[in-house]
């Protein structure tokens, strides 16, 4: 259908999120009406390729487009994601308690997960992550089974995703597993090793699947897909530019400071952060409970760590990468609940 064709064409030509296909075409359509001649100062369109991705989402997108339009595709995706969301919430309620189900629901609503099915590229990671949560919660799982599942999830994510919010497929199933009663009984520093090991396993599956596409695409097309992929890795992890600003850490921090200071928000936010840290320190139950909650704390830090490693990509595409913070909210709420108790503040004040 024409609208879908237009969107595909726009995506093909529009890499910069802050320009549109219309802006590019305007250079070629406009005339110098004073001279009656076509404009000759149009910038050249630089060709690019997405051959480094598997584009696995086409497995369900193309068949659906044979029987429906893009609206129908969205309806199917909404139904699938709603069913998976409900399944995760019900299983969390049944196996981990009402609080866990509420944490999950709140975290996903805060990042507008309900909007993800509107776009195929946003839908993929949420669907894969929720499916992983359902598998984890279906019955008690051993740590080695979970690590193997994370390997599979890494492969599936790499196959279907376009580097949107892949960390969700690692963190959400892992948090669901850590919240299960039998894992809470074993909670502690040992599980931190499982979190790290599971993350490495997921990363191996993710990277190997992705790299295999580079090799196969190069063999089939004769193009140097590996060089292009490695170049893109460098672009997304090194300092690039955004709105004319080089994305070094110094420039990023200076931009944040000047933006907040210009709105007289910097020092109030600093004060709020200091107060929150003081409240956190004063409300910690004890060191043992803090250690038991530490694996959940590590999961909460996965998304910030991902943003730091891929800072250029995360900032330039912040309009969709921010939804990965749903993992931080989910794991963070669980971490705070297990290691903190506001009643501890009153007890400590009485002692002083």
Segments from the language model and where they lie:
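Interfacial juxtamembrane loops and adjacent helix segments
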Residues: 1-50
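Juxtamembrane segments of multi-pass membrane glycosylation machinery
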Residues: 52, 59-77
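Aromatic- and kink-enriched transmembrane "portal" helix at the membrane-lumen/periplasm boundary
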Residues: 59, 105-128, 153-159
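Transmembrane-helix motifs of polytopic, lipid-linked glycan transferases
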Residues: 78-102
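Membrane-interface alpha helices of multi-pass inner-membrane proteins
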Residues: 146-174, 194-208
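Membrane-lumen/periplasm interface segments of specific transmembrane helices
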Residues: 195-276
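Membrane-interface helix-loop-helix junctions at transmembrane boundaries of multi-pass membrane enzymes
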Residues: 278-301
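Hydrophobic/aromatic-rich transmembrane helices and adjacent perimembrane loops
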Residues: 316-340
């Amino acid at each position: 259908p024409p609208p879908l064709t237009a969107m595909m064409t726009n995506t093909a030509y529009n890499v910069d999120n802050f320009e549109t296909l219309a802006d590019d075409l305007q250079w070629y359509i406009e005339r110098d009406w004073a001279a009656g001649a076509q404009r000759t100062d149009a910038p050249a369109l630089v060709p690019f390729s997405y051959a480094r991705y598997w584009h696995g989402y086409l497995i369900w997108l193309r068949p659906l487009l044979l029987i429906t339009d893009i609206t129908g595709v969205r309806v199917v995706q909404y139904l699938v994601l709603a069913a998976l969301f409900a399944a995760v919430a019900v299983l969390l309620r049944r196996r981990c308690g009402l609080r866990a189900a509420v944490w999950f629901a709140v975290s996903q609503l805060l990042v507008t997960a309900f909007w993800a099915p509107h776009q195929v590229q946003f839908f993929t990671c949420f669907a894969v992550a929720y499916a992983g949560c359902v598998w984890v919660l279906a019955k008690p799982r051993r740590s080695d089974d979970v690590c193997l599942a994370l390997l599979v999830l890494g492969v599936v994510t790499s196959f279907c995703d376009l580097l949107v919010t892949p960390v969700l497929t690692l963190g959400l199933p892992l948090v669901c597993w850590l919240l299960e009663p039998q894992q809470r009984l074993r909670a502690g520093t040992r599980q931190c090793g499982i979190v790290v090991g599971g993350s490495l396993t997921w990363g191996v599956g993710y990277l190997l699947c992705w790299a295999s596409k580079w090799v196969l695409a190069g063999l089939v097309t004769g193009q140097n897909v590996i060089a292009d992929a490695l170049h893109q890795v460098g672009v997304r992890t090194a300092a690039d530019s955004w709105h004319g600003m080089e994305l070094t850490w110094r420039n990023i921090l200076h931009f944040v400071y000047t933006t907040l200071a210009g709105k007289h928000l910097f020092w109030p936010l600093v004060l709020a952060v200091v107060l929150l840290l003081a409240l956190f320190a004063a409300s910690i139950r004890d060191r043992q409970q803090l250690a038991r909650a530490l694996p959940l704390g590590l999961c909460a830090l996965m998304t910030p760590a991902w943003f730091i490693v891929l800072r250029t990509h995360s900032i330039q595409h912040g309009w969709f990468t921010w939804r990965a913070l749903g993992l931080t909210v989910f794991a963070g709420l669980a971490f705070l609940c297990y290691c903190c108790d506001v009643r501890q503040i009153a007890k400590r004040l009485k002692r002083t």
